């Protein structure tokens, strides 16, 4: 137990343990076919658990490679073939479920290497370092505020402390009821912080997830502030694979599913889904698959398109169809720029700094 954990306990910080509800039977009584639509983190995680329990699972992924936004694919360059990716992705240490899945690829998680820092880079102000903080609250937050060059004591005195209290009082129901109709931009404006502190200490929570604070729910920002800073004992510490994602994650997980009797099929888009006697008919451009159970592990635009193309789902799965609009509209395919209301461009580190493959290629 670290000193920050001890201090937290002394002032009343306690862990809140959630009962996962048992997790179901360790094995199905007899093999039953299931189809998982989507081969990203959600789909492959579902396939791993189902295959281990004896389900005859088939993963159907529309792209030629697994992983979605965490995917990797080969690119032919003048100097040879290089694995390409969507950018730098690291795994925070409170990602317990995901790390449990990754242990199927490597029981020791030896392929994950710690990233030593978490620098916030700005075109206008000096670097702000979010790394190397005590892991446990409230010591991590206090240390960040005390050492930050972006926030002075006079700034804290002029801040609207009542407006800031919701950042410290996250609740999975009450926070969304109160703040989901307020933007993160409005919440940050109410704090009365100087531009530098706002951009370097708070807007980073929206920019790190490719959101602009003017279009992001204030409840989501409060949830992120809680989950990454105040709501876990691991702190802002994370690791990244020492190989590209395809080599380190997706190929081993696909082999794990296949070892347990499952199949992983890429380059196969699902076009429609129909209820049939005894299960479902999952149609693809090249044919189809019959399954007793179906897991839809798609992003919101793909899910909405599949539901629209499958009109019989309204009667077969009315709850699913009713929930689809709540997932939001598909975002425009535009180039993201981390530009806040202050006109300050910020970003978190460099891809080549954390990815060994990219670092080697840049040399």
Predicted segments, located by residue:
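Mid-domain catalytic core of redox enzymes
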Residues: 2-14, 30, 268-363
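Conserved Rossmann-like nucleotide-cofactor binding loop
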Residues: 42, 65, 301
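Helical element adjacent to the flavin cofactor pocket in flavoenzyme catalytic cores
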Residues: 224-285, 289-293
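N-terminal Rossmann-like FAD-binding beta1-loop-alpha1 element of flavoenzymes
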Residues: 30-59
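Mobile amphipathic helical/loop "lid" adjacent to a hydrophobic cofactor/ligand pocket
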Residues: 98-99, 103-104, 109-218
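Conserved FAD-binding subdomain of flavin-dependent enzymes
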Residues: 77-112
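Short, flexible hinge/linker loops that cap or flank conserved catalytic cores
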Residues: 26-29, 143-145, 288
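Glycine-rich FAD pyrophosphate-binding loop
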Residues: 51-76
